[in-house]
Amino acid sequence: MDETIKLSRSTVEKYLNCPRCCVLDKKHKIKPPSLPFTLNIAVDNLCKNEFDYYRDRQESHPLFIEHNIDAIPFKHKDIDTWRSNFKGIRFKSTEHNYDFGGAVDDVWQKKNGELIIVDVKSTSRNNFDWFETFNKYDYAKAYKRQLEMYQW
C-alpha cells in the first residue's frame, strides 16, 4: 500500500468501536451519517475567542488564576493551523506510512516553557465528577485517549 494512511483521534475511536466501519471509511471512503453538533461548535468558538483575547495580551485568563494554572495562552504563528480541522498538529511516519494528527482546541504555556495541550469539553451537569464519569461512561475513556494521543 503506497498511500499514506491519515489517522486521527476519531479514526482510533471508530476502529475501537467498529473496525469494519473504520476500514469502510479509510479504504473505500464510505462514511456513516453524522449529526451536526452546533452547540458544541458554538461553545468551542466562544472558548477560542476568549483565550485569543488573553493570548493577544499575553496574560493569564482569570480562570487560570482562580484554579492555580500557572500558564498563559501560547502565542505562536501556527496556532490557527493547529486548531484547524483537517490540518491540526501532525506526526508523519515514513517508516510506517501513516500521518497522525488532530485539531487541538488550544495550547497554553507555563512559565518554564512547558506546553499544555487543551481540549475543551462541555457538560450541562452542575456538579461534574471526572472520576465518577470516567468509571461510568465509555465516552470519558475516549476523551482520555484523545489527550494521550496529543501528548504523543
List the model feature ranges, each with a label.
Residues 6-9, 14, 26-31, 48, ...:
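Context-gated lysine
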Residues 2-3, 13-17, 68-74, 80-86, ...:
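Generic detector of short, locally flexible boundary/turn motifs and exposed helical patches
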Residues 1, 24-28, 79-82, 123-128:
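Short amphipathic alpha-helical segments, especially helix-boundary/capping motifs
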Residues 43-88:
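Acidic-basic catalytic patches of nuclease active cores, encompassing PD-(D/E)XK
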Residues 1-62:
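Charged, glycine-rich intrinsically disordered N-terminal tails and low-complexity linkers that flank
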